[in-house]
């Protein structure tokens, strides 16, 4: 009798251990890693995805990274007389923890973002000018806008405080299957509501004045996203956070993060243009038929193809940008119609015609950056002095009054327009591009999971387009791919994460 009881207890204990190991990812035997993964796009999203995929899947998986242009994507630079300058994403927030980690892990150096004084121009006059003295700036802001600047700072800080939860979630390997679920995990219905309301509507409801919104908020949206306060409130908050102090950049250019991540991930760079992706059944070396993805791409005039277990698309699925076709998927992959904002970056080395903005003499002008309001009727969104990516400090005072100025505009500047802005200039270079989405709430974000093992990173740009947002999306997609490959459903779309993790040491 005693022996029978002992055997029963032993059997039950064995069953309990088996069930426990099956229910716990850390105790479960992982599925063999995939043989090959394709990442399409070598901007910050694609290269950071490759980096995180390598960390999760290990050293044996082969990762191919496709890029038809230069590594770095929209983190491009422009040349002015032998010096490189940032064309697009130029500053990084001190709380962008993924970018900070990349720079540290890759051994890169940083520089503080260009300083200098800022003015706001409304088409007739400078309605606000910064002073070198902090107390003078406070007095100016309070005199013109009351305490709205302080209230705005508090509003942005509240959004940032909730947004920072993503780093804790990702450090514990939690992933989300949609942009909406990710945002809801951070800020609940408030964050989802911000996607569906304009910044103007949100801030008006919060009691901010029309003058403050026109003169302080709209110019920031114009320089950051080429749009105004009719963008969604979430991307508006992201934009306003870039008004904080402590902004920085990577010495040598922010694109060095991308090339560094490519090297660190030990990925194979394929300099070709992906034409289409098709799901096919292929017999692998195990002898079993397996569903895989055939990626067909072009290098020069030659067409090539290869098969992959997992594919991550890290380029906007916009016909003007990537033009990738998805063949024979059932159900069909959804069409993406998100319009991207056309913007033109112009770098000019010359002497600014300060009389456009002020009646003061040139030597008394003093401003390094001028932002414009919506009603300025000027043909630019902003203009500012910039340093080359190699300069650690702001440019030295010029002996001849010439600096390199970066101009953002909706349309390509004519020579006549450049001559209106400058008393004289030595050099001008222009770059028209589709820089970020055109925001028009309510926003419906594209799916992250396009098919069983086919993922899309850039849907997060419908919430906000920024270097850190792309890195967050990349980490999320890598975690999602890893957990879905291994059947770790309890690591995806978990409710109550904030409260759950808050109680952990």
Curated annotation (Swiss-Prot):
Q: Which reaction does it catalyse?
A: an S-polyprenyl-L-cysteine + O2 + H2O = a polyprenal + L-cysteine + H2O2; S-(2E,6E)-farnesyl-L-cysteine + O2 + H2O = (2E,6E)-farnesal + L-cysteine + H2O2; [(2E,6E,10E)-geranylgeranyl]-L-cysteine + O2 + H2O = (2E,6E,10E)-geranylgeranial + L-cysteine + H2O2
Q: What are the subcellular locations of this protein?
A: Lysosome
Question: Does Signal show up as a keyword for this record?
Answer: yes
Q: What is its EC number?
A: 1.8.3.5
CC cofactor: FAD
- GO molecular function terms attached to this record: farnesylcysteine lyase activity; prenylcysteine oxidase activity
Q: Which GO terms describe its biological process?
A: prenylated protein catabolic process; prenylcysteine catabolic process
Return the similarity comment. Answer: Belongs to the prenylcysteine oxidase family.
The molecule here is called Prenylcysteine oxidase 1
Classification from the root reads: Eukaryota, Metazoa, Chordata, Craniata, Vertebrata
Q: Which gene encodes it?
A: PCYOX1
